[in-house]
UniProtKB/Swiss-Prot annotation:
Protein name: 23S rRNA (uracil(1939)-C(5))-methyltransferase RlmD
Organism lineage: Bacteria, Pseudomonadati, Pseudomonadota, Gammaproteobacteria, Moraxellales
Catalytic activity annotation: uridine(1939) in 23S rRNA + S-adenosyl-L-methionine = 5-methyluridine(1939) in 23S rRNA + S-adenosyl-L-homocysteine + H(+)
Active site as annotated: 415
Enzyme Commission number(s) of this protein: 2.1.1.190
Record: residues binding [4Fe-4S] cluster: 90, 96, 99, 178
Keyword entries, A-Z: 4Fe-4S, Iron, Iron-sulfur, Metal-binding, Methyltransferase, rRNA processing, S-adenosyl-L-methionine, Transferase
Organism from which the protein derives: Acinetobacter baumannii (strain AYE)
Length: 463
């Protein structure tokens, strides 16, 4: 096995297990009692084994004990590996906590994620879609176009660590490459680490953020004390040499500033070519990390909504307009798209993006969607279609207002299958039917489940 476990802890017991199935987050599940060495008082107790796959016989070390279950980590594969086991592509896998499924075949990863979504829909809402759509897959392994990377200076060793947190730990593990990070970013990690190591103020740097647009790359340095002029100049020369945008952030988001602002505005850009729209964004703005999955997702959302020229669409949690602008293209100049987002800064960004694309039919409003918004004029105009793309907490507070919107079709984009299923149950009570659903492999090699679902109004219900 390729570095898929940390060093053993001698004080923790090791046992042999027969792995039966996978948990939702990709750990092997076994039970005590399947081997003669198991303690008799533990027979029947469930064990979650990191890196183990169904059908395998493994030796695992117990890492955590609770009343009803235990957690363990595989230390040795004792027989034939599962057909779904593959070699991890990253040399840091097993120590770095970023990925959790690199040892699982990509097809099986997607199958597992679909099972998770099916299970949650059944458990929380008692429903299944009429049709499961083909999963949206990532087209490349180095899919991440942005990353926050921790920085820690060890003065006794005069060594700077640039890397990600270890699994279930706040400790940073040093990395020299990242297999899921865009190659243009990953290839520069060693040189970036050496640069930070050379700075006088390296102990004051908390993290760096790398972001990639279609044609630009930004480096953001988060520092807790002011950097001297020599350090800033070193960072500037590095960025100039690479052709990158350089940003410094000494405090909160409002303190972000671009070095050498005369070279251009504080913006990166990406396009959704299928809709002929282009977006400008700041290094701190939320954007989808996987460009190819994002474009497929937006295309599918528009197809599911079956928009016609002149229709009205409401886009809740619209961000910088990732869905709103393509939707505006679909409804044409005689239609209307209303985007709503809590952040005033993101509303301004969406408004600016609509202007740069000449989409006058798109308008945006700032509103905390967890609070009552029924008194706002935009909420009482009626819509043909509704798109919801909430954070992990879901959109439960919004569900009570859905009947008032009058939408015939709803597309719900989710990053949490549990809250999607919960909200789906409410939509069914409001007379909607779950017609189609698909999982999206936005975060390949991780347990994160992204999904998209179509609901259609099938009957009138007096709420």
């Amino acid at each position: 096995m390729k570095q898929q476990a940390k060093s053993r802890k001698p004080q923790q017991p090791e046992y042999i297990f027969q792995v039966e199935t996978l948990s939702h987050e990709g750990r092997g599940i076994a039970h005590y009692g399947s081997h003669p060495d198991h303690p008799a008082d533990k027979h029947g107790k469930k064990v979650f084994i990191r890196y183990a796959l169904p059908g395998e016989t493994v030796k695992a070390q117990i890492t955590h004990e609770a009343k009803r279950l235990e957690e363990a980590e595989m230390v040795e594969l004792l027989a034939e590996p599962s057909a779904n086991r593959v070699e991890a592509v990253c040399p840091h896998y097993g120590i770095c906590g970023g990925c959790s499924m690199q040892h699982i075949h990509p097809d099986e990863q997607i199958h597992l994620k679909q099972n998770v979504l099916q299970s949650h829909l059944q458990h929380f809402a008692g429903i299944q879609p009429e049709q499961w759509l083909e999963p949206i897959r990532s087209l490349q392994s180095d899919y991440r176009r942005r990353a926050r990377i921790g920085v820690r200076y060890l003065p006794k060793q005069d060594r700077l660590i640039l890397g990600f947190r270890e699994h279930h730990s706040n400790r940073l593990t040093s990395i020299h490459t990242c297999s899921v990070l865009d190659k243009k970013l990953s290839d520069n990690l060693p040189e970036l680490r050496n640069l930070l190591q050379s700075l006088k103020g390296k102990a004051h740097i908390g993290h760096v953020e790398l972001a990639k647009g279609d044609h630009e790359i930004s480096l953001l340095v988060r520092h807790i004390e002011k950097l001297n002029n020599a350090d800033v100049n070193q960072l500037r020369q590095f960025a100039l040499h690479k052709g990158w945008q350089l940003y410094l952030q000494p405090k909160g988001p409002e303190s972000l500033r671009r070095i050498d602002e005369e070279q251009g505005a504080m913006r990166l850009h990406y396009a959704l070519n299928a809709f002929d729209v282009n977006f400008a964004f700041s290094p701190l703005d939320f954007t989808q990390v996987n460009a190819t999955v994002n474009e497929q997702m937006v295309q599918l959302a528009c197809e599911l909504l079956q928009l016609q020229q002149g229709e009205r669409v409401l886009d809740l949690f619209c961000g910088l307009g990732n869905f709103s602008l393509p939707l505006a293209r679909c409804v044409g100049a005689k239609g209307q798209v209303v985007g709503v987002e809590a952040s005033e800064e993101m509303v301004q960004r969406a408004t600016d993006n609509a202007k740069r694309n000449n989409l006058v039919q798109a308008s945006f409003f700032s509103q905390d969607l967890t609070k009552d918004f029924s008194h706002h004029s935009w909420a009482n105009q009626g819509f043909d279609a509704l798109l919801i793309d909430p954070p992990r907490a879901g959109a439960y507070e919004i569900m009570q207002y859905v009947p008032n919107f009058g939408a015939k079709r709803i597309v719900y984009v989710s990053c949490n299958p549990a809250t999607l299923a919960r909200d789906a149950g409410v939509l069914v009570q409001h007379g909607y039917q779950l017609k189609k659903a698909a999982v999206m492999d936005m975060f390949t090699h991780t347990e994160h489940v992204e999904s998209i679902a179509l609901f259609e109004k099938i009957q009138e219900i007096n709420d």
